[in-house]
Design a protein with these regions (language model features):
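N-terminal accessory targeting/assembly segments
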Residues: 1-15, 26
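C-terminal-of-GTPase-core extension/linker across diverse P-loop GTPases
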Residues: 12, 17, 28-150, 156, ...
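Phosphate/Mg2+-binding loops and adjacent switch elements
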Residues: 21
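Terminal RNA-binding accessory module
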Residues: 123, 154-157, 183, 193-194
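Conserved active-site aspartate in kinases
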Residues: 160
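Inter-motif core of Ras-like GTPase G domains
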Residues: 175-199
Length: 343
């Protein structure tokens, strides 16, 4: 039905994609983003850009092709201002893609730390019920425990992992396999919550974990804030986006963590009712358009109006592909392959 609506001109391609996004959205914010796209928010924004670029291209073509006619001269200052505005608009759309994807589909979040630092307690706090077994015995969690939770505006697919520590050659083979899986999950995660015991001094395992988190979307949680602090957070701070003292046994920690996650992932800056890009197809087309506009801007400052015109043509082609006006049959088929029968 959605494909038929697209082929009959009732829906644009971005609106058709929004139907599937709405069906598969995780949480209210993701649904709001999809609903905005279904209402035409993205299409209207892109169409406005196309109208400005088309008007600019017509002026350029008239000036270049009919120099003997009384065509108003193309002002370099106005040209640069128009192209800069177009580039900035596309930059904003592209910059918001990652956070929008998180709101739409959620993010895989791994809980990592030494044994008995409070990872499973954290999982239970975020889940809102006793999902994992918690005991004073180190190494209680040996395999990965999964749980999806809604944390503020973000859906987290949580993975509580085995405590990471050094296991000798003659150590427990099951625990060693659990630790191997923990490190593997770190490499796959879109978000890392690294847990440290605030009542103890940092260990070699703590520092190794911190170093492995460097350059990744990671938050350090120094747990057991309710006990005297012995942990020197400055030793791990360089490796994390932020370091938070928390007590995972207190409900208030959930709000603190939710705010930090939203800040790190950029979801707190997203207006769910505004235009946003969804999926690699849209991102790729918008990126090509942005690069073409940037090329036109460079050309306007040295190469001449012919080069500007070529780049503006490329930008218009990319924007028309984004909205579906000149999308190939293969692209259209790929979009609608995501739909199940009856949608």
């Amino acid at each position: 039905y959605t494909r038929r609506a697209f082929l009959n001109g009732k829906l644009g391609l971005t609106q058709a994609e929004a139907v599937m996004d709405l069906i598969s959205a995780d949480g209210r914010q993701g649904a709001a983003l999809a609903n905005a796209a279904l209402g035409g928010a993205l299409a209207k924004k892109i169409n406005a850009q196309k109208a400005q670029l088309t008007a600019l291209q017509a002026h350029l073509a008239a000036w270049v092709d009919f120099p003997e006619e009384d065509v108003p001269e193309v002002s370099q200052a106005e040209l640069i201002a128009t192209l800069s505005e177009q580039r900035d608009t596309l930059d904003q759309l592209i910059a918001g893609y990652g956070a929008g994807a998180v709101l739409r589909r959620g993010v895989d979040c791994v809980l990592l730390g030494r044994p008995n630092v409070g990872k499973s307690t954290l999982l239970n706090l975020l889940a809102g019920f006793d999902r994992a077994i918690v005991t004073p015995v180190a190494g209680t969690t040996r395999d990965i425990v999964e749980q999806a939770v809604q944390l503020g505006s973000v859906r987290l697919n949580l993975f509580d992992t085995a405590g990471v520590r050094e296991v000798g050659a003659d150590g427990d083979a099951i625990e060693a396999e659990g630790i191997r899986r923990s490190w593997k999950k770190l490499d796959e995660a879109g978000l890392i919550l690294a847990v440290f015991d605030g009542s103890e001094r940092p260990t070699r395992e703590d520092l190794e974990l911190a170093q492995r988190c460097a350059g990744r979307p990671a938050i350090a949680l120094v747990n057991k804030e309710d006990k005297p602090t012995r942990f020197d957070a400055e030793l791990i701070a360089p490796y994390f986006a932020m370091v938070l003292p928390v007590c995972c046994q207190e409900e208030g920690a959930r709000k603190v963590i939710a705010a930090a996650v939203a800040r790190l992932l950029g979801t707190s800056q997203i207006d769910p009712h505004a235009a946003s890009l969804s999926g690699q197809r849209q991102l790729s087309a918008a990126t090509r358009a942005r690069d073409a506009v940037a090329g036109a801007l460079d050309a306007a400052q040295g190469l001449g109006l012919d080069a500007v015109s070529v780049c503006v043509d490329d930008a218009l082609d990319a924007l028309c592909e984004l909205t579906g006006e000149n999308a190939s049959e293969a692209v259209i088929n790929e979009v609608f392959e995501r739909f199940c029968v009856g949608k």
